[in-house]
Amino acid sequence: MIALRDYQHELLDGIHQSMANDNKRIMVQSPAGSGKTVTMSELVRRANEKNNRVLTVVHRNELVSQISKTFSANNVNWNLSQVGMVQTISNRVKKGNVVEPRIIVIDEAHHALSKTYRNIINAFPNAYVIGFTATPCRLNGQGFTDLFDDIVLGKTVKWLIDNKRLAPYKYLSIDLINHEKLKHQRGEYSQKSISEAFDKKIYGDVLKNYEQHAKGLKTIIYAYNVESSKRVAEKFKQKGYKAYHLDGKAKTQERLEVVEKFRNGEIDILTNAELFGEGFDIPDCHCVILLRPTESLSLFIQQTMRAMRYQPNKKAIIIDLVNNWSIHELPDSDRDWLKYFEGKPPREKSEVHVKECPECLNVIFSNQKQCPTCGHDFTTETKETAYAVEDVELEEITEENIIRLQFKKPSECKSMKELYELAESLNYKPGWAYYQGKILGLIN
């Protein structure tokens, strides 16, 4: 059997209390990397002990074997349990080949509103439905109350980091794309516009920044499409790295073999196009690189936290090359998941609760009046406008959170904010930036 942690027991207690309150369909929120699969396995094991049959539904094939291994390790009774991919289970339900369960457990339950999941749920109206997710939110802002009666909330990401259940992280950010070219399609950026927003030189930038900040670390790179994923993998191979590209067209056996090679170190750079996010469990993955701009909070959290599985003395590296933090903040930002569940997102997407220090470029939470790194006083600051970044290099400013990049020369700067950043990178005083701003006509 697997020994659960205190917060996992608390989560199970919350589920049982919700069931005692006559809720039959319950969503359970717990952060990525918090051990949802272990918690699920204990829920199933306890149900089996009471002779209850449990059906567990997952949305990707490689997760079937991953979850099944955990279930076996926790002594789940396979005579009363079944784990399967949603499409497979749905087809079997239509044919009447699934024995009625007492409980339906859904992994990554933010997908559960789709037709295939509903077909399964509706086929067994008397069953309890327990859906686990790290991100109870939808791209269109609608909630989940049309399917679930209640939500049980787990510990926050900050709590898990502070209590050594998730690894702390260092967030490095640059902006290598032209955001003006990004166009929306069904609430998300279209693939065509993403491709147009990227400069071809980005593939070299990915390698350069990896070697500068994460060289030797096992890394997952989230590319924006299959072609870009292949190009990035090839760029790394040319430099002698053990890199491999995978996408949804790869056969199941190939995907499982590649994942195992990544786990045991035969592959150290894994590039993919939206394939390895949810539920992909590799504790020794130390770095993720984001090459896919997204307005999906769920996708952002799933990808950024893939490197935050806990190991002693580990610090995850998150390299954001598309400025996703400016939309979604940071992995451990406070979020009111109850409001998301109810379909009442707490604020507009454009209103972020982090800010950038104009003196040292550290990115901190907005409620801080003084920069903890350089002591800059925000109460006397004049608000600047947002800016785009071109021809830049990553530079580490602080031990954690986001580090922005520096410009090459004054003539490339389009605002005083950019000039002050350049001055900082050159170790010049702010007065130099002011003088350059006068020359460039940025100050009247």
Question: Over which residues does each language-model region extend?
Answer:
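Conserved pre-motif I regulatory segment
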Residues: 1-27
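Inter-Walker segment of RecA-like/P-loop motor cores
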Residues: 64-100
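Post-DEXD/H (motif II) to motif III coupling segment of the RecA-like Helicase ATP-binding lobe
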Residues: 111-171
